[in-house]
UniProtKB/Swiss-Prot annotation:
Localization in the cell: Nucleus; Golgi apparatus, trans-Golgi network; Cytoplasm, Stress granule
Designated gene of the protein: PARP12
Keyword flag Glycosyltransferase: yes
Source organism of this protein record: Homo sapiens (Human)
Effect the entry attributes to changing I660A: Catalytically inactive mutant
Biological process annotations from GO: protein auto-ADP-ribosylation
Family note: Belongs to the ARTD/PARP family.
Modified residues (ADP-ribosyl aspartic acid): D600, D611
Catalytic activity: L-aspartyl-[protein] + NAD(+) = 4-O-(ADP-D-ribosyl)-L-aspartyl-[protein] + nicotinamide; L-cysteinyl-[protein] + NAD(+) = S-(ADP-D-ribosyl)-L-cysteinyl-[protein] + nicotinamide + H(+)
Protein name: Protein mono-ADP-ribosyltransferase PARP12
Keyword flag Hydrolase: no
Main location: nucleus
Length: 701
């Protein structure tokens, strides 16, 4: 089944089930029998699904719930006695009251000026564009209710504050908004049945307001679920979520809201929307197993066509225009063979009547300096003449800001990180004698004395296809001294690439590795130990070590040698590109979604998969840093208590006696040794075997 068809079936199953299902139940109900991995890859479909973590009942573990999401809305300009939309929008022309259950005008014996049909040419075109033309009317209404905020009556915020039967609401019973507990609707009310706020849509006060809108009794009974779904979708789609997503948050798909600001979730989505840096350098060892996008440029422009993302033509010209903050929209075509052009709106990220998106490589501030073809984001502010000024740039008529684009980008990424608090939403800086605050939510900078605001813009630095070719062929080196270990073979340092050096069983280096392995696996026989020499990975690891040491006030970083079991088919890919838990297999997720490393080889042996009696295991060098007990829902270490932007470095199974470490940032790991061992066919007696037997017997005396 084509992917668009599978996406359509998942959407239909969810909408038929009330808009959301637990992940295992969703998989069970699908007709095509998707594997768990295939379903999770499918759920990365941008804008089609949201995965939320909801607390289980009583002592039950948290549950991953999949929700049907969509940018589809009712056209507000079409509503009312004088519909004002001429049909150029990408939204449904449908009577709002019909969606509620029954048109109040028809019930009163009057004519309704709004459309009551989904089969008009306009509506059918909109449904096909959004890939939902196969849904039934009820399924479509469910999708609209939990995604279109205009359809849901507003909850009175004043009612949810203060004491008294109506909280602090001055209108009391005359209030046109619903008086109901907002925390109940979010699934977060800790008071339950003892809550002083109403949890009932059917009480006389709320029911009267809902019936005036024409809501059916069936719809009223479903409102708690609808509001809960809408809350989770909004929380995931328009703000840095405090509920960890299903996938690790590092994607860089560019999506914007109507104000022109980048939605924070664009930095917190899965890496499946991120272009693979190794593929651009023609060196991705994971190949078709890589979870990132493989493309020949560090950017990719696409539009949504019938639920599937398609490439736009002339991406280089689009990218060049987008990199200019003065340009808000351009005309472009979807392919060279078509004569039809549509407007690509950079602020709204729309292409004609449908959605558009920009995929890109990782932000340059998240990678070491020598990584090529990362995305350099430039931050601008609009001056009093409407000209865009780059942060930190000298040589202009304006005072130089005390923060650069790089500083702003780092702060913005911290704000977009799941778990960041409200303090991370702003960045204070100076320019001349004035103090300012940059607000990442509103995308404005504010003068803290006069209160004046200026627009803020974030655009990438342009990289042409010729620039890509040049950077691919140039031998970019790390700007700093090489510090390879003195025991490495300096004649075996391919750059790029790696080489494995087989260690002599009589060497001290071999014995150190063997002793660590033998401590918990004394009856397993080591066939070979190889040292991995990858100059690029080693330099990245040393750079990461330096960064962590700076953040630690100059103190040494806790560095350990830990084991990681894997399948032999992934060994070369790991040696080339480091560990990636999405590709190399999951070692459980009890303490977070990351790469698992163990103090004991016996633990890692359980994950050393092999069809023969020969197994493979890594002994890695790991920067564990400061750690905290992990949790299955973590997609990165949590923030330190009392800090807004300071996070732990790793998660463990026990803080007092850790034996399992979860690493979320692969630069904290270097795959130092590959151990090949067997569970049978005892080899001839060697000094290492005698040493093993001697240590074993002495430990039993």
């Amino acid at each position: 089944m084509a992917q668009a068809g599978v996406v359509g079936e998942v959407t239909q199953v969810l909408c038929a089930a009330g808009g959301a299902l637990e992940l295992p139940e969703l998989r069970r109900r699908l007709r095509m029998g998707l594997s768990a991995d295939a379903l999770e890859r499918l759920l990365r479909q941008r804008g089609r699904f949201v995965v939320a973590v909801r607390a289980g009942g009583a002592a039950a573990a948290p549950e991953r719930v999949v929700l049907a999401a969509s940018p589809l809305r009712l056209c507000r300009a079409h509503q009312g006695s004088k519909p004002g939309c001429v049909g150029l929008c990408a939204q449904l022309h449908l009577c709002r009251f019909m969606v509620y259950g029954a048109c109040k005008f028809l019930r009163a014996g009057k004519n309704c000026r709004n459309s009551h049909s989904l089969t008009t040419e306009h509506n059918l075109s909109v449904l096909r564009t959004h890939g939902v033309d196969h849904l039934s009317y009820n399924e479509l209404c469910q999708l609209l209710f939990q995604n279109d905020p205009w359809l849901l009556p507003e909850i009175c915020q004043h009612y949810n504050k203060g004491d008294g039967p109506h909280g602090s609401c001055a209108f009391q019973k005359q209030c046109i908004k619903l008086h109901i507990c907002q925390y109940f609707l979010q699934g977060e009310c800790k008071f339950g049945t003892s809550c002083k706020r109403s949890h009932d849509f059917s009480n006389s006060e709320n029911l009267e307001k809902l019936e005036k809108l024409g809501m059916s009794s069936d719809l009223v009974s479903r409102l708690p679920t609808i509001y809960r779904n809408a809350h989770d979708i909004k929380n995931k789609s328009s703000a840095p979520s405090r509920v960890p997503p299903l996938f690790v948050p590092q994607g860089t798909s560019e999506r914007k809201d109507s104000s022109g600001s980048v939605s924070p979730n664009t930095l917190s989505q899965e890496e499946g929307d991120q272009i693979c840096l190794y593929h651009i350098r023609k060196s991705c060892s994971f190949q078709d197993k890589c979870h990132r996008v493989h493309f020949h440029l560090p950017y990719r422009w696409q539009f949504l066509d019938r639920g599937k993302w398609e490439d736009l033509d002339n991406m280089e010209l689009i990218e060049e225009a987008y990199c200019n903050p003065k340009i808000e929209r351009i005309l472009c075509s979807e392919s060279a063979s078509t004569f039809h052009s549509h407007c690509l709106n950079f602020n709204a990220m729309t292409y004609g009547a449908t959605q558009a998106r920009r995929l890109s490589t990782a932000s340059s501030v998240t990678k070491p300096p020598h990584f090529i073809l990362t995305t350099d984001w430039i931050w601008y502010w609009s001056d009093e003449f409407g000209s865009w000024q780059e942060y930190g740039r000298q040589g202009t008529v304006h005072p130089v800001t005390t923060v650069s684009s790089s500083d702003v980008e780092k702060a913005y990424l911290a704000y977009c990180t799941p778990g960041s608090d409200g303090q991370a939403a702003t960045l204070k800086f100076q320019a001349g004698k004035h103090n300012y605050e940059l607000d990442f939510k509103a995308f404005v900078q504010k003068n803290l004395v006069y209160g004046t605001t200026k627009k803020v813009c974030r655009r990438p630095k342009y990289v042409s296809p010729q620039d890509v070719t040049t950077m691919q062929t140039c031998n970019t080196k790390f700007p700093g001294p090489k510090s390879i270990p003195d025991y490495w073979d300096s004649s075996a340092l391919p750059d790029p690439g790696f080489q494995k050096i087989t260690l002599s069983s009589s060497s001290e280096e071999y014995q150190k590795v063997w002793n660590l392995f033998n401590r918990t696996l004394p009856f397993y026989f080591v066939q070979k130990i190889e040292r991995v020499q990858n100059l690029a990975l080693w330099e990245v690891y040393q750079w990461q070590k330096g960064q962590m040491q700076k953040q630690n006030g100059g103190k040494a970083v806790d560095e350990r040698q830990l084991f990681h079991g894997t399948s032999a088919i992934f060994v070369d890919a790991i040696c080339q590109q480091n560990f990636d838990w999405r590709v190399c297999g999951v070692h459980g997720t009890s303490y977070g979604k990351g790469s698992y490393f163990a103090r004991d080889a016996a633990y890692s042996h359980h994950y050393s998969k092999s069809d023969t009696q020969t197994h493979t295991m890594f002994l890695a060098r790991v920067l564990v840093g400061e750690f905290v007990r992990g949790n299955a829902s973590f997609v990165r270490p949590p923030a330190k208590e009392g800090w807004s932007n300071a996070f732990y470095d790793s998660c463990v199974n026990s803080v007092s006696d850790p034996s399992i470490f979860v690493i979320f940032e692969k630069h904290q790991v270097y795959p130092e040794y590959v151990i090949q061992y067997t569970t049978s066919s005892k080899p001839s007696v060697t000094p290492s075997i005698l040493l093993a037997l001697g240590s074993l017997f002495s430990s039993r005396q």
